[in-house]
Every structure is written in structure tokens, then in C-alpha cells.
Amino acid sequence: MAEGIGTFGTLSRDVLEERLMEARRTYRLNMGYAGLKQLPPGFVELVKKYNPHITELELSSNDLTDLPDELEEFRYLRILRLKYNQLKRIPAVVYRLPQLMVFDASGNRIQKVDDAIGHLSLLKELDVSGNEITTLPESLSTLPKLEVLQVENNRLELLPESLGELPGVIKMDLSTNNLRYLPASMGQLKKVQRIDVGNNLLTKVPPSMGHLKTLKEFNLRYNHLDDRYKAKVEEGLSKFLAFLREEEERERLEEIERLKPIGTPVGAYLEYRCKAEVGQVVKTDMGETTVDNRCWIRTGHTLTQVGSMLLIFGGQLQKDGSTTNDLFWMTMDRMEWHNQPCKGEKPPPRYNHAACYDEENNRLVVFGGRTAERKRLNDIYFLDLDSWTWFKPSTEGTAPTPREQAVATFWAGSMVLFGGHAIGGRTNDLFLLDLGAWQWSQPAFSGTAPSPRQACALCIGHGNLLFVHGGRNNFVLEDLHVMDFVSKNWTEIPCEGRVPPPRHSHRITVHRDQLYLLGGLDELGAQSVAMYRVALPAGQQDTYATSKPKWVEWDSELPYNKNRTATLWNGTISIYQLGSNTLGRVNDDDAEKGLDELRPKNAKRMRVQHTINTAGKMPRSFTQHSAHEARVLQYVQDFQRIFEELYPYRRPLYLTPRNECGVPKFVCTSLRPSQLVYTELYDLDGASQFVADFLSYEPLEDPLHPPDTLPSPMSALEWRAGDSFDMATVLASMLLGVGYNAFVVLGYAPGPVVQNDQRNTDLAATRTGAGAEEEEESGPCKFVHAWVMVLPGKREVTEAMFIEPSAGRKDVSYDLSDPTKWEPVFEDRGMRSRADGNADESETEGGGGLDDGEGVEAEVVPDIPPSWVPKLTIPRDAFDMRCPRHEIFARFGDCSRWDGMVERLVLYADEERTVVTEIRETFTRRRDKLRERRVYPQKDTTIEHFNRGSVFALKDILTVKNDRRGRKVIQYYTGRDDRLIYISATYAVDPLAPRPQPSALLEEYSSLLVAEKDCLQWVRDGEWEISEIIRTRTNQEQNITLETPYYDIVRIKAEESEEVREKALKALKDRLIERANIIQARLDEESAALAKRQQTFHRDRDQMSAAEEEDYERQTEESMFRIHILERRLRRHEEQALHKYYELDAKLRADGRLAALLN
């Protein structure tokens, strides 16, 4: 029957027939050692003729590179062995064998196990040892039946964190790999008996593995374990597991202590800043969800303390008035809020409800309240705090009527519910709910019960006593009652001393025979911050009516806070409030103190005074004059003196103001032409808008006169503030640097312009009548202002324009004939020229520059010296943070975000910022080595850039969504002289060529088949690689992990500290080896040159002159000397290298940042 198959590797037909007959009897087909490179066509059909239900297939010791898809027709195959083949990946058909229980692919060249391995739900044994695997998929942990996992002799560096979730694994062999640590989840292996992780790079073992009760053998030989682990391993398995449990407890306590916040003492209290992460990704049974952990300020909620944990449920949010059913929790160890996603039947949103903690079953029980539609409730829900699951139990008995602001507490396995505002009014009934049988009951009580009330305070004391205080009905109450659950009798307690004023919504608790009272609202709704206590009688309840305990008021040391919630538990007060006076919020009571010191101060004068005090830190040109500057200043002063003599009633010229160091400078030298690196500042509009946005406008201290101080544009950019003169100086310097013909001009401006007030701009232009007459009578405005004037002739400027620096606008009138806006500096009559005036006076004044230009000697007027201001620069972060050109830029701290983002820039296409064109995100400390991501929403394109060391050695990834490319290429043309529109090329047989022989056609056909197969394989490999990249990137983005910086001594762990030490030592070792190689290379080069010179000498010695022989001897001597020096240097380097290595190791171990974790 094997005749139709032809040759079958190295197996003869008789042997094949024998093995097929054996498969018919034993359901096991052995095709090992057959020399197969692939299973031939028809193999599956041939085997099915003999036995279609084979359960074991042996294909070991062949040259197989893949398996055909037809193999999945063996539906009953349970054992598949592919040892010692040439597989580079597990064939895809293997994952489609539903009954497979044993799979052996050891001794191949497999580099990766696909996620599809999770489809083999019946797999019991998996052997992929002796391959080139570097990682294992997370889906491996979903195999419910897996008992044996053998991955030894591979290149594993990481194990999936969920590996310990394998429920039935018994044997696990991970030896001879490159593992540096084991996942902590391996401590969850419930049935494991043998674990082999020998011959790896492990330095420690997860302490959670100390709980492996079934473990019988644990091989840790040939690793890099520290001394403590080595010593415990040698003592035996039981003692080593006990050591791991001790390590786990120690690390847990250290982690709690490390993450514990540090409080600020405020009297007897400690104040903490509560933290909350926005956008945290939380894993649930339904998948991953993103939660907002900010616990917004609310009212009508419940705050319940469970040990060191605080639970907040429900309430009305003050930010928007919405009603919520969210559950938040926080521990005293971390002071960090968490919005807990819960399962089960969640209660509807509510407020003014009651809640208590079930101590026996670890549950939070919630009753009643009001919905968002103001409907009162009387339902019961409880939350299992172990599984975070809500339940709505079915209760029996007569339940309380729907109500709000009832109070509840826990006693003897029951919830005690008292009072509240029901539909018919306030109540004073008391209910008990058995939390085991969920049975409502209302016992009969005697004595003087409290009057109906709501929002009172309730607590349990002395075992069986229930205390009730205050609350409100039509009035706010102050009475105190006690009820004994044994005698079922109510008693009102008459008190003396400083009795707390009437209040409601407060808290009471019993601690060490003292009843404490805190907080509440008084009759006017004002918050009370006082705290009271009263000593309780030591006898039975009967003594309460006659003992008259005395109230004592304590100084609570709590300032006022408009929103505060508190709990009293186990002698500790826990208060959650809005803001803190101690931790940064300004106390309003101090706002009226020191009014004399709060008078407005000129910010510029204060900055200048500070610069004068620290002038020694400024550049030398700021505090001194060069010789050239001194000559120009003398010339300018002479000119200014003559001008004042000629025009005594004119405003003095603004020529030599003082700089920020108090040194007079010529005003023209204060401009510093500078071309910055930012392209947005190369044009007029961009530079003008930048100055208006970047610098904060400050009015002049004296708006009627120019400022006494004109700081350099460098200081104005550092201060990021200034008046019109400072802003104009900065803008003119930038425009000059990019080629504009810019000047700073001085003039008068209306009050709204000087004050940068645009509220009445339109109204001022429409005023007529009396208002206009009053303005004319008051004369023209004399408020001083500065602009930037840009003249035509450069940078394609066609007409002159004036720029308002504080707004970046160009709407200033250039009509010089308008006398209301322009005033001539020199009158029409001019001034005396040198030819008409007194020559002696002119000579005395040094020319003064006041003549008409006739007979002037050019050398008399000095040239303007270079600017005393350094070249302007703007830091990148300062430039980016101003949000120019429809951009929003955000920068984050290195450790502030969970995803490692440090910069985010969003570009918009419109001024309203509604159309996003590009999003640039920069990351750091990412384990996936992601450096930058650019998203173009309009093009559905994403570009990601990676650092070295990324998976698949990725450098860049370009992802384009919804991009379909056709299979036919047509070239289209337009505007051609030959009228060509498009070209579409096809190929056919050349009719003029000689007809090929059949053998040639067969050979070509065979080669094309092989080429087609190779091409298809390349395509499949490419598709597989692309899919793996996409899957890996998806997993990385869903499980982002960050590398802890070595300088973060708070968060860095021991293994990370060890890694820092190893990197430092490796860097030193590489540098020492590199230096040794350099010395050796130079030594080899000198030795080769000497040998070549000696060979040449011996060959040409007879023809060499005496001078040449002397030169040879001199060069040989120099070479020998250099070789000797290099040999000595190499020996000394080898001797010192080891010493330097141990010296650095000792320094690292003694370093304070690493010693606590390494030693």
C-alpha cells in the first residue's frame, strides 16, 4: 500500500510499510531518523488509510523546517515529538491540535513561542529545551493542565510575570539560561515539586517562593547568589524556604516604611498631603480599566475606618453637584487615594446614607440614604473587602422605613441602626440587623429613649452600652443617652462642666473609659473645631443617671476648614479635609496683618536693586566702560548739554540711561542684534507675538517720564517682565538680528495704551459732546511710551510701520503731519551751525554734532562702540512653555508620570485649538526603549522612535492606518507635449525568439516554483515578524514599566542597585581592556615596524653607506626604546587594572546610596 508514495527520505518502502502497520496496531507512528526536510504531499492521506486515529507522532531527528496544515486532520493526536530538527519557530498547525497533551520540540533553533500556545488547553508536557528562545509569552500561564515545563538550554533573559499562575505544574526546568531574576508570582505554584534554575545569573530568589509547601527539590547551583542566599541553600531546602519567608516579611516591612509619608507636626496632630494618580490603569476580571483616583470633596458620604484603611462611599460632589456611588480607599501607610473598581451588584448612587464595618466578615454594610432624584431608600448592600464584590442580600423581618441621615454601628454580629429622617418625619426607633441571617428585628426597650432625630452621633462602649448624642429635629440637640443591650433600658445622662453646645453631624467614641466628641455643625450651620471628653462611670448603667459626669473641653488645635470629615477609632483621630494651612495654604486671618508692607511696589525697581546688590555676578561689560564707550559717553553728554542750553523748555533727550547694574550706558549700545535658533522668530509677526506673549507687561513707575533704568534685553528675557521700553529693546534686538531695519522710538500715548487697558477702546472713539470738550481743555496726554519702528528697505518691508511691543500689533498711525500724535524734536528754525556760530565755542564743545554738516571733520564724531550686551539666548524649556503658534506644551518630572512621559507638545491648525494636527510625546526611562512618539491624527499616522536595546532591535516604527495599496501600478502624467496620459506595462512571450526546449521549460518551471515558495516564505516571515512587532508593542503599551533611576535611592530596589554596580564595574572593565588593547596594538605596530626595518637592513646591507647604517642603528635604538616603554606600560597597566577594579567595587559597596541595599 506504500507504493503510491514514492521515495520517503531515507526510509525504504519496506521500512515505511512496517512502520505504517505498526501505527495501525499501536496508534503510534514513528517517522524519526528519516532524513525528511518536509512531509511530502499525500502523507496525511496515506497515514489515514492505515489509522485515521493515531495518538502519537514521532518526527524527531529529521531536517524539518515546518509542518503542513493538513496535519490538523489528526484530531486525536495527543503526543507530538519534533526533537532535533531545523525548526525556527513552532509550526502554526501545532496550535490547532485540540487533543495535544505532550509536545516536544527540543534541540531545534526556535527563537520564540507564540501567544497561540494558550490554545492548547489539554497540554500537560511542554519541552522546548535546547533552542534559542529569549522570552516566553504571557499566554503560557493560561494552560490549565500543564504539569511539566522544560525550557533549559535556551537564551531566556525574562520570564512572564504571570508564570506563577500555572495551576497544575509539577516540574519546571529553567536551567542554563540568562535569567537574572524570577517573577514573584512563582510563589503561587501550588503543586510544584521540582524547580531547576541552575546555571543562570540569579542573585536572589523571590521571597514569595518560601510558601511553596509541595516543593521537594530546588536546584540553585551555578548562579550568582549573594552570600546570605548561598549559606541558606547549603543548609537544606526546608531552612531555605523558612529563610525566604523571613525575607518576605522583612521586605514587606521595609516597603511599608519606605513608602510611608512624613507628616508635618501641628500641635498634637500630624498633617499629610494625600496623593492621587489621575488615569491609573487597573486590571479587573473584565480587563483593564482607567480610573481617576482623585477623591473630590463631597457631602453626605460615609467615612469608615477599617484598621489603617479609610473607606469613603457615595455622597454629593461639590464640583458639579452630582451624586456618586464610587468607593475610595486610602491606607495610613501610603496616604494615597484609590478609586476601587468593584464587581457584583453595585448600589445606586446615594447620599446621607449609613454605613458600618462588619468586623467578623470583613465587609462594609450600607443602608438607605437618598438617590439623585431625592428618593429615600431602605435597601441593604454589603461589600466584601477581600474580593471587592458588592452583594444585595435578601433580608427577612420588618425592615426600617426609607430614611436618610440615620446612624449605624456594629455590635455582636449585628448592625445597629438608629434614628433618621423618614417619609413621615424624624424617628427614634432602633433596629438590629443580624449580618449572618440577614434578619431585621426591633427589640422592645424601656426607659427614657432619645427624642426623634437625625444626624446624631452613635458609638458602642463598655461592651454592651450604646451611646447617642445630639443630632437635630426641629432644633439642634445636645443631650446624651445610653442604652444597655442586656437590660434593654434607655437612660439619659445629666452632665455638668463645659457641656458641648448643641450640634449635629459630629462623631463620638469611647476610649479607655472616656467618651470623646469631635466636630459637628451648630445651630447656625457653622463648623465646630472644638473637642470634648467626659469620664464615664465605672459601675453599671444605673449609675449614669446619678453620677453626673463632667464634660471637659480640649484645645483641638484645629483651624477652620470649610470641608472636613473625621473618624475616631482605637484612640486615633483621622481627619480628611480640604487643603491645609500648615502645608501651604495662606491663612486668611493673616491677610490683614502688616498692611503697611502690602502697599504696591514696583517690581522692576526691586529687580534692579537685587541686580545691583549682586553686580559681581554680572558680566564685566555690565559694570565697567571700555575706552571706546567712555569717549562716546563724553561726546553724548556734551551733545545733551548743548541741546538743553538751546532748548531749555524741551524734554531732555533719553540718551544715557543707567543699566540694571546702575552704570550709565549709551542707549544705542543697549540693542544687541541676535538671531535665535527658533524658526518662529525669523519673521516680523512671529517675533512681535513672541515678545508680547513671553514678557509680562508692567506700566512705568512714573508714566510721565522715561524710566531711569533701561536694563539689557538679556536681563529682560531672564526676568520675563518689563515696561514698554524693555519690551521694545528686546523686540528691536531680535528684529535686527534677522535682518530688519528696526529702531526703538519714544513718544506719548493715551492712558489705556500705557496701562495696556483695552476695555474702553471702542467707547473712547465714539465719545462726543461734553466729554470731548473736557479732554480738549485738559490738554494733550503726556504719558510716555516706547514702540519699535521698522523702516522699509530690508526683508521685503514695503512701508514703514510701528509695532506696539506689549500687544505685538502694527496699527500705530504713521502720519507725521498729525500734531495730536507727533511732535518735532527740532523746531523749524533749526539750530546754529558751526559755520554761523562761534567757532571757538564749537571747538570747545568738540563739535557736539549739532551743525548742518558743512565743514565737519569725520574723525571728530566717534563711531558707536559694539553693544555691551552678550548675545541673546532663550532656553528651550522657557521658549516651549509659552505656547506659541497654536501650540500647547507640557513638561513633566522624570518620576511624575506612570508612562515615563516628560514632554508633550500638541499642535493645532486653528486659533481655537479644536483641530489637532500633530502630537509629539517624549519619554524617558522606558523599558521598551521608546524615546519619542509623533501622532498625526489627520493622516492616521504614528511614528515612534526607540533607543538602543529595544525588542526586535527597533529604531523607528511608522504606522499608517486604513492605508490600502493596490496590486497594479499605473503611472499617470499631465501636461506632456506628447499627450501621454498613463503607462501600464504587461509582459508576453517574444514571438521572434526561438522556441525553448521542453527540458528548458521544465527547468524554468521548477526554478520558478522554488522561487515562488521562497517568496511566499519570505512574505510569511515578514508578516509574522510584523504581527509580532505589533503584538509586542501592544503588550508593552498596555503594561508600561519604567526603569528606576540609580539616583532615586528611595524607590530603587536591591536587584536594581546590583545592576547599577555591575554596570559601573563593567564600564570600568571595558575601559581597562580597551586601554590594554590600545597599548598592545601600538606595541605590535612598533614590533612589526622594527622587524621590517631589520629585514630590509639585512637584505640591503651590502649596498648601504655608513651614514645609512648609522641612521638604521639610530632608528633601531629608538624603536627598541619605544618597545621597551610600551612593554613596561602594558605590564604596569595589567598590574593596576585588577587593583582599580577592586577599588571601585569597594567604593560602590561603601556608597551610602547603595550600601543599604547591597550589604
From Swiss-Prot:
InterPro entries: DRC7/lobo (IPR033551), DRC7_C (IPR056292), Kelch-typ_b-propeller (IPR015915), Leu-rich_rpt (IPR001611), Leu-rich_rpt_typical-subtyp (IPR003591), LRR_dom_sf (IPR032675), MORN_DRC7 (IPR056291), Papain-like_cys_pep_sf (IPR038765). Its main location: other. Kelch repeats lie at residues 309-360, 363-413, 415-463, 465-513, 515-571. It is found in: Cell projection, Cilium, Flagellum; Cytoplasm, Cytoskeleton, Cilium axoneme; Cytoplasm, Cytoskeleton, Flagellum axoneme. Keywords: Cell projection, Cilium, Coiled coil, Cytoplasm, Cytoskeleton, Flagellum, Kelch repeat, Leucine-rich repeat, Repeat. Residues 827-837 have a biased composition (Basic and acidic residues). GO terms for cellular component: axoneme; motile cilium. Residues 827-857 are annotated as: Disordered. Phosphorylated. Pfam families: DRC7_C, Kelch_KLHDC2_KLHL20_DRC7, LRR_6, LRR_8, MORN_DRC7. Component of the nexin-dynein regulatory complex (N-DRC). Interacts with DRC5. Belongs to the DRC7 family. This is Dynein regulatory complex subunit 7. It comes from Chlamydomonas reinhardtii. The lineage of its organism: Eukaryota, Viridiplantae, Chlorophyta, core chlorophytes, Chlorophyceae.
